[in-house]
Every structure is written in C-alpha cells, then in structure tokens.
Amino acid sequence: MRAIELPELTQWCTSLGTSLGACAEAWQGFGEWMSSGNGINVGGLTEFFHREQHEYLLQSAQWCQLRQTEVIGDEFSLVEFDMASTTIDELKACSADFKSVISEDAELNAFGGWFDTDFRGSEADPAPQPVTLTTQPESTTHWAQQVFMVHPPMNVQVGDTLEGTVKCARQRLNHRLMWVQLTLTLNRAGVGQVGPERTLNYRID
C-alpha cells in the first residue's frame, strides 16, 4: 500500500463532491414534490440519505489503474499469508502498523492498495526458480488497484512521515467483502505532528 497523489483523482474528488451536492439538491426537490404532491414529509429521512451518499461516494474503495508517477510515498506491507498453512480464522481480520516517508511535495488525496503473490514452493519442495506476480501500478497484469480516498486531502512535503495503523475485517453479511479502517498522523522534521490524528473508514464492496 502506498500514499498517492492522483491528478485525475483530484478532479474525481471534485466530481464526487459535486455529485454529493447534486444528490442533496435532488433529494430536496424530491422532498418538496412528495410534500406538495402527496402530503408526505420525508424530512426524517434526510440525515440517513446524506450519510448513505457520503459513504458510497467517499468511503468506498474505488477500482483504478494507477501509474508509478502518482506514487508519492514509501510502500508498506499490511499482511502476509502462507496459503499452505493459513487458517480461515486468520483471514477474518488483520491489523498492521505502517510508516511511509513522503518523496515529494504534493497533495495526498488517496492511498493505493494492491497485492503480490510469491510462488516459492514449500519447505519440502521449494521452487527451483521462485516467481513473484505483482499487481502494483503499471505491472503486466489484468488486475488494477484499489484506491482509498483521503477527504479532505492533506498537503505533504518531502521527508514527511505518515504513521498509523490499518485494520481490515470481513463484512458481516458478505465475507468476500471487507471493512478497512486507517488511522494516521502526519509528522514533519523540526515541527512534529502536523494536524490532528485522522481515522478514515472504508468499505471494499
């Protein structure tokens, strides 16, 4: 997983923010129509509607094909599984601390996630020539990456350090889907912590 800056995603975030506003306007119009035409007040649902739209547009992981030029921080590994010995219980949830040093002055507006698969054989029958297949940005694969948007974005500088914890767990109703929580702080040399600690929650649907 890496910190990334996406020029397109900046536009995308703007578009999503605009979409959020458009949804709010559409809901208001719907409410007025329901009230005047049907005598029904849907105002009690407004908070739930806004929350649902915010979660869908800004707190759901998005499929994206990233470029290496959009990566602005060190890669960090969240978890490793030995598929020959991993149990189902071990797959239910995982947690990892991370640290990523920023490599350029930029706007951090997302984290990118992907996976690698190492074919090493086993202890009893090791592969004569281990092979790693990666789904990192611009790799030769049909897979793309997951993008976890940071909203509002963070201004970062060369040498800044992002530190925190990533927690992943299966969703209750569908175990193929995941909940992801990312807690992070931004630290700058000679300054210390910049801004408050942030906790970001996402769904991978």
Regions from the PLM with identified roles:
Residues M1-K167, Q171-D205:
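Class I SAM-binding transferase module
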